[in-house]
């Protein structure tokens, strides 16, 4: 089921399901208990979070609860992460709510370059490929604590040290945590 929560609230109770079905819900704010009440038939029910980059066959797909058929399906188009309980899955839903914020960072940096006289195509190519490379580096190093990359990317009195210090002073990273907490609170009703 891939509809908005408002549409889901309206239509799910009117749909007919069979007990032999496996139902996958992409609906962010309707939990498993609510879905089961709306569906009224005992089915295999899984919540999943496939984000737009899955169209490129890239990215994680958290699923809850674990389900072999659903995992095998999503492993063909991404990287499935099985979450044992719904309470923990809310953390993944919360972080997925930061996708637009990530794109806005890219937009702000590209726009800044454009205002400095760089052609839009060059600005966007530079920023997007820079962040792609940084993300790939983070994936390669994902078994290490990510603070390692923060430390390794700075040189004493260097530009990255300055950038990190300025953003830390302004509470940028605390704001990220506060935003995640607000999204989590909305989902954890």
Regions from the PLM with identified roles:
Residues 1-63, 67:
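Rossmann-like NAD(P)(H) cofactor-binding subdomain of soluble oxidoreductases
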Residues 7-10, 34, 122, 145-148, ...:
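An acidic, carboxylate-rich microenvironment
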Residues 2, 99-103, 155-157:
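Transmembrane alpha-helical core positions of polytopic small-molecule transporters
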Residues 128, 132-189:
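NAD(P)-dependent Rossmann-like dehydrogenase/reductase catalytic/cofactor-binding core
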Residues 34-44, 59-93, 97-143, 182-187:
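Internal alpha-helical scaffold of NAD(P)-dependent oxidoreductase catalytic cores
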Residues 49, 84-85, 124, 164, ...:
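Short loop/turn and capping residues at structural boundaries
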Residues 3, 7, 27, 97, ...:
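Short coil/turn residues that cap or connect secondary-structure elements
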